[in-house]
A protein has these predicted regions:
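N-terminal leader segment of winged-helix/HTH proteins
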Residues: 1-28, 32, 79-81
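Charged, amphipathic alpha-helical coiled-coil/dimerization segments
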Residues: 74-134
Length: 160
């Protein structure tokens, strides 16, 4: 297998996972990014007992532009499932949380997804899952390092 074929294999696997999430979102009448709002808030409420996320955190975690996230939030505000308010601790931040109706909606949307993820993960031993995570992180770190070096070279050339 060539280097290119190995890289293509990684991206095809990532794309396949993304398509599964995209189909789930589509089956519920929303985009993947819209679903991610509910996913991230539910994840936080279960793991951190924090039932909200800031707009900045959404942008960072989804690696999406603020304008895109803002448009998605505006659409979801109209559903009545989420609400947005100014963070009392940092008035420059906006907090996105679920309304009571939104909590029920998010449970119906996200909890079966969490269950499917856990069922899929159960197909692997703990050692296999640890290895999958380690290898994915290793590839991401190596890719980031290589790209940073190339960006640095381009910046140095354009500054000359």
């Amino acid at each position: 297998m060539t280097k290119r074929e190995r890289v293509d294999g990684i991206y095809e696997a990532i794309q396949k996972v993304n398509q599964v999430y995209g189909k789930w979102a589509s089956a519920h009448g929303m985009t993947l990014y819209e679903m991610q709002i509910y996913y991230r808030i539910m994840e936080r409420s279960l793991q951190k007992e924090q039932a909200y996320i800031t707009q900045k955190e959404l942008c960072d975690e989804l690696d999406a532009p603020k304008t895109s996230i803002n448009s998605i939030i505006k659409r979801q505000l109209k559903t009545g499932y989420i609400e947005m308010e100014v963070n009392p601790v940092n008035r420059r931040e906006k907090i996105i949380s679920l309304t009571e109706t939104g909590k029920q909606y998010a449970r119906e949307l996200v909890l079966p997804l969490f269950q499917s993820e856990e069922e899929a993960a159960a197909q692997f031993t703990e050692q296999e899952m640890t290895e999958v995570i380690r290898m994915q992180e290793k590839f991401a770190d190596a890719l980031a390092k290589s790209m940073e070096e190339k960006v640095s070279i381009v910046h140095n050339l354009s500054a000359s």
